Amino acid sequence: MKKYIYTTSLLFFVLISNIKAQENLSFYNLNDYVIQTQNISPVYLPKYKYNFSTPLNFGGDINSTIKLNDILVENGNNLKIDLNNLNSVAEDNNFLASEMVVNIFMLGIKTKRGSISFFQNIKSNLTGEFSNNMTEIAANGFVESFSSSSEKIGLTAYSEIGVGITRTFLKEKLAIGLRLKYLSGIAHAELEDSAQFSLDIDPTNFLWTLNSSNVTLNTSGGTDIDKKAVFGQNAGFGMDFGISYKLNDKFSFDFSANDLGSINWTEDVTNYNLEDATDVVYNGIEFENRDNVRDDLENALRNIIDTNESNNSFKSNIGSKILFSSKYQMSEKNVFRATYFSYNNPYVDIKPSFGLGYNRELNKSTYGVIASTGGNNGGFRLGANLAVQLGFLQLYGAIDDFSSLYGKVEQSNEANFRLGINFLFGYSAKSNDDKLAEKDQLLINNKAN
């Protein structure tokens, strides 16, 4: 258990300090030019008859209140971990949310009245929230009383394999998209939501009074990843839903709800439990040798509270996302879009984000910029997107915050990017209704002649 907790903690801080991120708003504005946008808006219709992708499509999102230089400080020509500095800048509540996505495979086929797609994605999410009580302990040890009830952490990695169908109605004014997904859990760790732990230390005699309730760490997976990534025993079901409506030639509206689903964790499950305790008193010790403080603490806790391990299966939600946008077609090639994004994370509260973007839409390429705000870090961000076609090859990229490119890495606490390559065949610039209208007009002209 010790090794597992230490590894998870290290991963927690590495991911905090690595990248800068937002919530796919720039990528969303690539619209129907890129087939992967169906991952966040299943109602988007591809422009090409056949769309094929490989694992060369990936992206990441990170949002944190902690920066790299809050943890690592210069020490001559080297860097060192400075927990005192981390403790000095820590807020009452500190936050992290990250996501990595790899599109393993995707095949999209445009039909007469919509599209059908087949896909597989690998996703990993790490979310955490911790108080400055934890940073105080990390920096100075157990020298005073503390209470822990806001600490939360959830780490999930899973594969999704599915099929998506989009259908148009009312002369292509209305479109509805639905994607059904089989979920296969790869690895998971979560602290029970209602876990509470408090320790009252009397500085005069070092008596400890300890209380704990519902302190359980549920874990699963982490081994035989190749087998679990396809059809493992940690199974679940997910769904994406989207709807769009074209009010007139100028205005249209899109709504999508993604990642509605959960995973049942039944394979390689271990529950690490700290038994409930109420006002348990222990004659504490003063830690004089900081090198052995971890072992001393562990031994002391064993004398106070019993710990045990179990193998009970459990269920976890994957975290739903909501996107709503309003599109204004200023002219044939100039589009403005206002977007609202909300993430219902199963472990922490994440504030919604808002974006206002512009895209120049050409026949086979598009490029644009977007200004956004919101999220737990707030502030103003400026991003951009691009999709170009070179023969049957498509290259695309999107980023929500330019400062993640030119800013100092050690001062970063937020980032979002999407990159990929697709193979496209059978371009169709006009809708089916446009084609039918042209045929009718041609027949009328022929009869008139």
Predicted features along the sequence, with ranges:
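Bacterial N-terminal signal peptides
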Residues: 8-15
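Bacterial N-terminal signal peptides that target proteins for export
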Residues: 1-8
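Sec/Tat signal peptide C-region and signal peptidase I cleavage site
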Residues: 16-21
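Subset of outer-membrane beta-barrel
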Residues: 22-449
